[in-house]
Design a protein with these regions (language model features):
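Cysteine-centered catalytic environments shared across enzyme families
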Residues: 1-299, 316, 540, 568
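Short coil/turn segments at secondary-structure boundaries
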Residues: 13-17, 88-92, 161-171, 220-228, ...
Length: 574
């Protein structure tokens, strides 16, 4: 079972605890999986435990002895002291298990950056870090679940389902209990109760952001880090807090790694990056991306245990490999900031339906100041205010997403043209639910990214997705979180003076269309999609072949085609 993932190392350790056997695998260069054993219990932990020192101190104050400094020992003592609720206290990127008697508890981190999968067999319950490991233990090595594979392609995969037959995903922020012949899965984190629970002014929110973000950044630093630096606001925000303290703490500067595009000027952000590293004194390494989305596709869909939508694993692997070559074990990125501080959909309707008239008036005045007439302001707010049956009917009539769906895809597979799932909710709940959507659903993209990184010997850290920072962001009142029409305005205000004004005042956003289109591999698309016998229901292959012959995909059509190629590669390689 452990041997099914040789990229995790060949140092194998197993321990029998009653009727349960726990095993870990490690690479000599990076031991990130630990095992703790007591006479009647055991624990395993895979990943990074950011707050181990704080937890150990709290346990010792309670009179509990922590056997050693490994994360597994901390988890062991925590479960012994606080039970399964101790998982709520853990911070970091992880999956793990605790065994006592006949019961085993498997757990996964709040946001789902660590991985955990499970399945049932006649002999009982099996769980592992990777789906392929569970698949092997079930006697169904790498057997695809064709229905689930199609669901992945069309974006409708159920949260617990995977692309491998018989293998279940443990959802983020969840734990699974197995004992006495039963298996139950339960969530341990319920962030919905936090939404708009704080009453803070904008100045207080900016101060609170700096406090929480500084803690989030500090937690991720190891002394062997590389920051993937862009010219936006997200990764520069990490640089602003990490770089000044990095050299005093670790004796060298925080290294930045940036992709440059000399042949695609519309994509290149070098001038912004240069301004950041000059102000913060960061060593910079640049590279010209060479990987394309379908490079070595069969290998990657095998490693990631399924096709991945949207994310280009070869391109991620390229920068992780370069980071490792720079000596990094931890790769910092500003990813997911948009889910924490940018989702403002249905803001006007939320303010109106909750009678926050002053904030609503300020929002309308801000739109008017951009030159929009009152009719445009009303149209902007109307869908958020309309009852579900009215809003849904209106958007279906508009069918605006026709340009996002290729003509060779049956619209019925995605719920029909114009379907807006957010508008199917009660109008009063739409903004609140939008703040939480990123914490729901199957997490196949971040799982695939984690497996890619693990295969290259690094962890990917996303300070903006730190649990305490995310909880703080959820707690902010809507009008404080989004005080004006400027994206991430709160972050820009908080970082004024810490980053160049060139970055904080930047209003444009880099579009990567030119780079995406340059990476189109029509020969690979034809090889994987057309030449094989497998067919996905709802895809018009004759029409798709005609489009491939023309070799003139737009960005969205190319992304759909790449996703379909990964589906075919995954099914055919089985």
């Amino acid at each position: 079972m452990l041997a099914a993932s040789p990229h995790r190392g060949t140092e194998l350790t197993a321990h029998a605890c009653g009727r349960v056997t726990l095993g870990v695998s490690n690479d000599a260069a990076r031991r990130d999986t630990t095992l703790a054993v007591q006479p009647d219990a055991a624990a395993v932990f895979c990943g990074v435990l950011d707050n181990a020192q704080a937890l150990n101190a709290e346990l010792r104050r309670a009179g509990v002895d922590v056997a050693d400094e490994t994360p597994a020992a901390t988890v062991m003592s925590a479960f012994r002291t606080w039970g399964a609720t101790s998982v709520e206290r853990l911070r970091g990127v992880f999956g793990g298990a605790f065994v006592a008697g006949d019961e085993i508890v498997v757990f996964r981190d709040h946001v789902g950056f660590g991985t955990a999968f499970w399945g049932k067999r006649a002999a009982g319950f099996v769980a592992a870090t990777e789906a392929k490991q569970v698949s092997v233990a079930l006697g169904k090595p790498h057997e695809p679940d064709l229905e689930a594979v199609e669901d992945i392609f069309f974006g409708r995969l159920a949260e617990q389902r995977t692309a491998l037959l018989g293998v279940e995903r443990l959802p983020r922020a969840s734990l699974a209990r197995s004992g006495r012949g039963t298996i139950s899965v339960e969530r341990y984190w319920h962030p919905d109760a936090l939404v708009e629970s704080a009453q803070l002014s904008l100045d207080e929110a900016c101060e609170g952001f700096l406090v929480h973000f500084d803690e989030a950044v500090a937690r991720t630093l190891t002394g062997r880090d590389v920051l993937l630096l862009s010219g936006g606001i997200d990764s520069p925000a990490i640089a602003a807090l990490a770089a000044p303290e990095y050299e005093p703490r670790f004796g060298r500067g925080l290294a930045a790694l940036t992709a440059v595009y000399p042949d695609q000027p519309s994509v290149d952000e070098r001038r912004y990056v240069d301004a950041i590293v000059a102000q913060l004194g960061m060593p910079l390494r640049t590279y010209v991306p060479e990987a394309r989305p379908l490079d070595d596709v069969e290998r990657w869909v095998t490693l990631t245990d399924g096709p991945v939508d949207t994310l280009s694993i070869p391109e991620s692997a390229e920068c992780y490999r370069l980071s490792r070559d720079l000596g990094a074990v931890s790769v910092l990125t500003g990813e997911l900031a948009e889910y924490v501080f940018t989702i403002s959909a249905h803001l006007a309707g939320h303010l109106a339906l909750h009678r926050r008239w002053r904030a609503l008036a300020a929002w309308a005045r801000a739109l008017r100041a951009t030159g929009r007439p009152w009719s445009a302001v009303a149209r902007r707010a109307a869908p958020s205010l309309a009852p579900a049956f009215v809003a849904g009917r209106y958007t279906r009539l508009l069918r605006r997403d026709r340009r996002f769906l290729p003509g060779w895809i049956d619209p019925a597979q995605v719920g029909g043209l114009g379907r807006r799932r957010d508008l199917e909710r009660r109008a009063r709940d739409r903004w609140t639910e939008a703040q939480l959507d990123a914490l729901r659903g199957a997490s196949i993209t971040v799982e695939a990214d984690a497996l890619c990184a693990a295969s290259l010997g690094v962890h990917v850290r996303r300070p903006f997705a730190d649990v305490d920072l995310w909880e703080f962001a959820l707690s902010l009142p809507a009008e404080t979180k989004f005080p004006d029409l400027v994206p991430k305005s709160l972050i820009r205000r908080a970082l004024r003076g810490r980053l160049p004004d060139l970055i904080l005042d930047r209003k444009d956003k880099t579009a990567f269309d030119a780079h995406t289109l340059a990476g189109a591999d029509y020969d690979a698309l034809r090889k994987w999609i057309i030449d094989g016998e497998y067919r996905v229901s709802g895809v018009d292959y004759r029409r798709l072949e005609e489009r491939l012959d023309r070799r003139d995909f737009g960005v969205m059509e190319l992304m759909w085609a790449n996703d379909l190629a990964r589906v075919h590669a995954f099914v055919l390689r089985s």
